[in-house]
Regions:
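Membrane-embedded alpha-helical bundles of multi-pass transporters/translocases
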Residues: 2-465
């Protein structure tokens, strides 16, 4: 029996475009915040890294908090859309603030300015916006194929935006003057673009009525729960923990790829190569995303596709290491593209896997926690990206890197090579290992079979007990 369809083509594109706004913040922040602070503002990489790590202590709480708040929201716009819309206003303001550290301030005041701006951006506004945006996957359709398609559209826009920002920002800043004020100007332009696109995206989709979302389920007063209970439900779901782990590892991977700006500048002696490598990363990802829905159908699920994709990614990154030590930039780009091609399917169907994880919690615990379940997207992005950026700062500081120097010691050059060549390979191997155990689709099928529920049937609360 064919599943009911809920979305038109323009709903899918409108939803997907929301990640333009998300990556205006994320790609810009993770790729260029550290170079801005160390090279233009003159702050120490190690101290910046430590401040980012401290900021992450706040994030774990806010992720669960906003996920729980979304689950409890009842408005004319729905559960998630208000948070997506209004959260981005704060994102735009604090993004500019992160790249507008007054050069006239004392050193301690500069660190304080950055820490407050960064914590508000990541711990509050980006959290509210991103969790709400991700939760829409399960709130605007109940069709599993449409959820996979939404993920593909979303990440096509995400990687296209990331590609564009990584490719043009260095030149854009140089044209604006190349100093700290130039970074502020670029941040303002990016923030305005993100605000406009986020608004259009939120208004392009409509959440299903709660009655339709809960169709076939028995209303149960015990379904109400607080943030502490929501946290316990998440921890009991091993697949949620796996997804959090892969998200964190992916962001650590991304942080090391972002640190490529140092590798290109000091080791390869050409900072403009960073933009060229961005093409090698993002174009194959986009190609893979286009074919992900078809491959999911062909292989009757996401598990095999994701695992095989990351086997290819590991092979690709291993060959990047070989090419790097050979000193061949063309081969490095070619193998970077191969690795990215393998990473693409997981990016495309990740949201659908999270929806399956939410179903797993309902089948095992009898509780609906869709909004809270999607906290893993924000939690993983922020913790992984934040720790990754912090590690970059710590490693650079440890190696003796000083951003304002005309030359760098050999220890710093060796560290840049380790960060850009070896660490991405290590993180890909770890992700492959986790994905080899993330077969939540089969787990749900077995649970439904045990409870006498048809595989394509809407889960009824009375069947859980």
């Amino acid at each position: 029996m064919e599943e009911k369809k809920y979305l038109k083509w323009y709903n899918k594109i409108g939803y997907g475009s929301g990640d333009i706004a998300g990556n205006v913040v994320y790609a810009f922040l993770t790729s260029f915040m550290m170079p801005y602070l160390t090279d233009s503002v003159g702050l120490a990489a190690g101290v910046v890294g430590t401040l980012i790590a401290v900021s992450k202590l706040f994030d774990g709480f806010t992720d669960i908090f906003f996920g729980s708040m979304i689950d409890k929201t009842h408005s004319k716009m729905g559960k998630a859309k208000p948070w997506m819309l209004y959260g981005y206003i704060g994102c735009a303001i604090t993004l500019v603030s992160c790249f507008a550290v007054p050069v006239s301030l004392g050193t301690t005041a500069k660190y304080a300015w950055f820490f407050i701006s960064y914590t508000l951006l990541n711990g509050v506004f980006y959290t509210a916006n991103n969790i709400a945006y991700s939760a829409l996957t399960s709130l605007i359709t109940k069709n599993s194929k449409e959820r996979v398609q939404m993920g593909s559209y979303r990440f096509i826009f995400a990687f296209s935006t990331s590609l564009l920002i990584q490719a043009i920002t260095v030149g854009f800043v140089d044209k604006c003057g190349g100093d700290a004020a130039a970074w502020r100007t670029v941040a303002i332009i990016y923030a305005i673009i993100g605000l406009v696109v986020n608004t259009i995206s939120a208004l392009s989709v409509k959440e299903l009525p709660e009655e339709e979302l809960n169709e076939g389920e028995v209303k149960d007063d015990n379904e109400k729960y607080g943030m502490v209970q929501a946290f316990k439900l998440l921890v009991k779901n091993k697949y949620y923990m796996m997804i959090c782990g892969t998200y964190i590892l992916q962001q650590l991977y991304g942080a090391m790829i972002g640190a490529g700006i140092y590798y290109m500048t000091w080791v390869l002696k050409n900072k403009n190569l960073f933009g060229q490598f961005a093409w090698a990363v993002n174009i194959p990802l986009i190609i893979a995303l286009i074919f992900t829905p078809t491959l999911v159908g062909k292989w009757k699920g996401m598990y095999k596709l994701n695992l095989r994709g990351y086997v290819l990614a590991v092979i690709g990154r291993a060959l990047v290491v070989v090419a790097g030590y050979m000193g061949s930039v063309p081969l490095m780009m070619a193998f970077t593209a191969l690795a990215a091609l393998g990473q693409g399917p997981w990016q495309g169907d990740m949201n659908a896997v999270i929806a399956s994880c939410s179903e797993y919690t309902y089948l095992t615990q009898g509780k609906r926690i869709d909004g809270t379940m999607y906290s893993c997207t924000s939690l993983g992005v922020k913790i992984g990206g934040g720790i990754g950026t912090a590690v970059v700062g710590w490693l650079l500081e440890f190696s003796g890197y000083i951003g304002t120097n005309a030359t760098q010691p050999q220890s710093a050059l060796d560290m840049m090579q380790f960060m850009y060549l070896w660490l991405p390979l290590i993180f890909d191997v770890l992700i492959m290992f986790v994905l080899s155990r993330m077969n939540v689709e089969d787990a749900n099928k077995k649970l439904k079979a045990e409870k006498g529920i048809a595989a394509d049937e809407v889960t009824d609360a009375s069947d859980i007990n």
